[in-house]
Curated annotation (Swiss-Prot):
One of its GO terms (molecular function) is ATP binding. The keyword Iron does not apply. GO terms for cellular component: plasma membrane. Its main location: membrane. Its EC number is 2.7.13.3. It is an enzyme of class 2 (transferase). NCBIfam families: hist_kin_CseC. Residues 270-472 form the Histidine kinase domain. This is Sensor protein CseC. The gene is cseC.
Amino acid sequence: MRGNLRRPGPAGTAGPGRTGIRTSADGGRARPRTGAGTGVRAGVRSGVVGVGAGIRTGVRWKISAAIALVGALVALALSLVVHNAARVSMLDNARDLADERIQVAERMYEAGRAQSFGVKLDDPAIPRDLMMKVTQGRRATYVADGPHGVPDIWAAVPLKDGRVLSLHTRFTDRSADIMKDLDQALIIGSIAVVFGGSALGVLIGGQLSRRLRKAAAAANQVAQGERDVRVRDAIGGVVRDETDDLARAVDAMADALQQRIEAERRVTADIAHELRTPVTGLLTAAELLPPGRPTELVRDRAQAMRTLVEDVLEVARLDGASERAELQDIMLGEFVSRRVAAKDADIEVRVVHESEVTTDPRRLERVLFNLLANAARHGKPPIEVSVEGRVIRVRDHGPGFPEELLADGPRRFRTGSTDRAGHGHGLGLTIAAGQARVLGARLTFRNVRPAGAPGDVPAEGAVAVLWLPEHAPTNTGSFPMLPLSGG
């Protein structure tokens, strides 16, 4: 049997050690003692909540789970502290009561009166540890583990005639009920703390998650060319926190990148503009040369240089996001058929479904001609053009587009060919993509392979697809569109 002995001393101090002995001189009053061990352990059952794979692991749920976990740990720790403190306090009160009763019984015995409180003389059931302290001539109390975990309270005092007067009581039912009620209240309070912490975490995490989603959406708009969008304005709020700092940093980065891009665009445009005059003069001078093969070479290279300068200027204008589309209503199939026939009569045009569209004919022609030129330069005949509703497809039967172009899209001065001589400058598809953006259209590229063939099988051709918008927008990304008055 394991128990706690307490022998009241003259000053009411607790004895050292785990035995919890408290002694007192005859006639002394034992004071309540805090922190004494009772020899009883409180068992706490903890539950583990499984999180399924289907639950979204966003910021709000992570914050909610963290707050709930911390709240559960704090509630558990406080519950244990309160439970043990309450139990120790009630046991101390029971000991003090037993000590007072044994003193009264001692005085009644010495006065020759009848005993009360269930006091016994020389009770053989007195715990051995308590008996050892009593034989030292001091009064003492003792707490032992009783059946079903209910403590037994003992008090004993040595008499002048050498006998031992003892008192044995059980922890009262009322005290046990109080402990049960306390434990129940602690459990309910802990559950309330966990649920309250979870709700608070969802609220806080939801606000943070919404701001982050707004920041991500604004950043995507900036990436798509929306120069007027600011992440800081998108997330809103008046409190400056880490999200606000992140938004300001993204805005600063976007501004710095935009300034650098704008500076590079201006330099490119200025250089191309300055080259336009001497190149025009060179082309004019070449026309004055006498006929012959050298003259043809000079004229061809001068014309190529002039085309390059014009293309560079066009790319610079498209990068400046200041281009406007002059809209007209046209029959797309008829328009494509006439333009392709004027460009190359050998190219087959198939109109699957005619459709009336509102677009800029000049820019659409530029996109179409650049796609045809790319197919003729890098692909193999036959070149096929099809029109189906608002969709234009240009296909060749060459080796297909380079993987870099399929992954990253057209890039200026990158042709995908190791030998750039006679293969253009990589500006044709770049201009086509830029003009498509001005039109509010979408330009995609893919390679044609046999059905079910793996990716390492050589392509049997390349297809460029231009998807014109169903409705003519007033503002497409960073390229506004202005309709022509009078059609």
